[in-house]
Structure formats: structure tokens, C-alpha cells
Amino acid sequence: MSESASKTPGSYSRVMLKISGEALMGDQGYGLHPPTVARIAQEVKSVHDMGIEICMVIGGGNIFRGLQGSAQGMERATADYMGMLATVMNALAMQAALEALKIHTRVISAIRMDEVAEPYIRRRAVRHLEKKRVCIFAAGTGNPYFTTDTAATLRANEMNCEAIFKGTKVDGVYDKDPNKFPDAKRYDDVTYDEVLQKHLGVMDASAIALARDNDLPIIVFSLDEPGGFRGILAGSGTYTRVHG
């Protein structure tokens, strides 16, 4: 077992926060909802104020989802590249919200676009974290056919994060959709293999396998719960821990 796998959330010092693009659109159904972006930025600030180093990956599904484009006849690689560009837009929006709160932030893109984001250079990104800057990794892995969940797991490993925090609309991993089934059971702990075998939908299989192979815990929690992110890192809160 790796050192990070044996730690509890209350002892983490560097984490990856993964959120979906849909989390930024509020109730409007599409695009960016500035008050929602600002609320999430405030949650990130509350953790940053604890001295914890923060990486972020944000999906792009509120603007464009590559798989949907592919299903409608678009070439998959082209659709995925469009989805990557959507993640850059979301990253810039989050950067603006964080810097409005006086949090130094860097957007780091896997696809070069030097006028708006830094290129991904691992050692430079680590140095940003050491200087307590929030690093938002955009454009996925830079390659089609990989999800932003896989990108978050990859970057979390490269940055030596102690866990991935997957912010969702529910407070953990359930055996079935709790919004549809009142008798749904929430797991406090679940293994990577159980997630894969039971199709629990935490992340895609590639991301789960990459986390499993590197003993990287995944903490699934509700991003809609005020103070939830900070609470878990302070040693309390409701969540599911995915581990080996």
C-alpha cells in the first residue's frame, strides 16, 4: 500500500478536485452560470485557506461532449478535440472566479494555446503548487479517446496528489441512483474492483484502473453541499472512499 493510500482525508496536503462541466451550468441546462462558478470557487478557496495544495480538472459537457458529437455522425477524434477546447473555456472561467477571490491560479493546457494558458510542463506545474497556486489542468490529456476523468487521474499521479476528490450531485457512491430509488444504499468504502465489477459509475474504467494501479484513493462527495469539500479535508463530512 502506498503512503497516500494509507492516509485519511483529514491528513491530505495536496489533492486533485475533479468536477464535471455540467456542475458549472447551475439550473440553466447549458453553458456557464456565473453565480455557480463563483460558489464553487469559494469552496476551493476555503480549502486553499487551510494550506492545502489544489489541482483541478473540469469537464466540458456543459458546452460540448465529444461522445455525443460522435453519436451524431461527427468523427470521434474531431468531436473529442472540440470537447477539449470546451474544458479550456471552463478552466478560464474558474480561473477568473478564483482570482476574483485573490487566489493565484494557473490554467495549464495539454494543447498549446500560449495566449490564454501555459503549456503542460510537469516540473513547472509542481513548482506552482509548491508556491500555493491553484493549477487547473485543461484540454484533457491532449489526446482524443480519453475522458477528463482519465486526465484527472493522470495529472493527479504526475503531481503526486494524495487523492482525487470527485465532486458530484450526490454525497457518495450508491448501489443505484438515489434520485430514483429511495432504498439506494450508500457505500462508506468501496474497492476499485467493486466499482468496475458492479458498474457503479464513479469514473470510466480507464480512470479507475489508473487509480488502482497507483494506489490513488478517490473521494466521492457532493459538490452541492456547502462546506463539504473543506469538511472532508478537516476530518468530517459525508463521502465514499474508493481504494484498494
UniProtKB/Swiss-Prot annotation:
Pathway, per record: Pyrimidine metabolism; CTP biosynthesis via de novo pathway; UDP from UMP (UMPK route): step 1/1
GO CC annotations on file: cytoplasm
Keywords for this protein: Allosteric enzyme, ATP-binding, Cytoplasm, Kinase, Nucleotide-binding, Pyrimidine biosynthesis, Transferase
Entry-linked InterPro entries: AceGlu_kinase-like_sf, Asp/Glu/Uridylate_kinase, Uridylate_kinase, Uridylate_kinase_bac
Enzyme class: transferase
Annotated PANTHER family: URIDYLATE KINASE, URIDYLATE KINASE PUMPKIN, CHLOROPLASTIC
Protein source organism: Paracoccus denitrificans (strain Pd 1222)
One annotated GO biological process: 'de novo' CTP biosynthetic process
Protein activity control: Allosterically activated by GTP. Inhibited by UTP.
Main location: cytoplasm
GO molecular function term, any single one: ATP binding
Positions contributing to ATP binding: 18-21, 61, 65, 168, 174, 177
EC number(s) stated in the UniProt entry for this protein: 2.7.4.22
Lineage of the organism: Bacteria, Pseudomonadati, Pseudomonadota, Alphaproteobacteria, Rhodobacterales
Entry-linked HAMAP family: PyrH_B
Family: Belongs to the UMP kinase family.
NCBIfam families (UniProt xref): pyrH_bact
Highest taxon above the source species: Bacteria
Region ranges (Involved in allosteric activation by GTP): 26-31
Subunit structure: Homohexamer.
Intracellular or extracellular location(s): Cytoplasm
Protein name: Uridylate kinase
Residues that, per the record, bind UMP: 60, 80, 141-148
Role, per record: Catalyzes the reversible phosphorylation of UMP to UDP.
